[in-house]
């Protein structure tokens, strides 16, 4: 069932997913193989590079809601516990700062254990938001 849904998501990808996939597909991004709309555990991730244990998530407007923040945190924690590094990009960055997004992906592929300050801050904000929702 989940695999059929993943197949549907691949068929019906958004414009930003299509734009990023065009840059990542066929090992043309630094020789790394990415998969799109890949089931991992109970989730379907937007893009994954298994050899780098890197997941890329593209976040639309729904991710800013209280529920979206809590869900993303739970999902990121699950994926992290299973050995993946999750990097999130808001959809507007794909459209307006695409070169910066590609540079950030390159950085994460070359430095799999490093988290830039902005990402550490974002993860802290997600944790605080989740704590408020759990209280």
Language-model regions, residue ranges each:
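Solvent-exposed, charged helical/coil patches
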Residues: 1-32, 112-135
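Basic, amphipathic alpha-helical patches used to engage nucleic acids or provide basic targeting signals
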Residues: 9-13, 41-108
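Short secondary-structure boundary/capping segments within folded domains
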Residues: 26, 37, 46-48
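Glutamine-centric residue-chemistry signal
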Residues: 28, 37-38, 62-63
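A generic structural motif
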Residues: 32-33, 84
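Residue-level detector of family-conserved "landmark" positions at structurally sensitive sites
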Residues: 34-37, 89
């Amino acid at each position: 069932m989940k695999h059929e849904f993943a197949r549907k998501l691949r068929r019906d990808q958004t414009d930003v997913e299509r734009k990023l996939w065009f840059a990542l597909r066929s090992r043309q991004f630094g020789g790394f193989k990415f998969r799109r709309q890949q089931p991992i555990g109970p989730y379907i991730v937007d893009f994954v590079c298994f050899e780098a244990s890197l997941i890329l998530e593209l976040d639309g407007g729904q991710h800013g809601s209280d529920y979206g923040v809590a869900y993303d945190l739970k999902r990121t924690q699950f994926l992290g516990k299973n050995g993946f590094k999750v990097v999130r990009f808001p959809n507007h960055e794909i459209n307006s700062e695409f070169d910066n997004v590609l540079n950030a992906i390159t950085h994460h592929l070359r430095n799999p254990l490093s988290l830039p300050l902005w990402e550490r801050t974002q993860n802290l904000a997600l944790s605080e938001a989740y704590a408020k929702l759990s209280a």
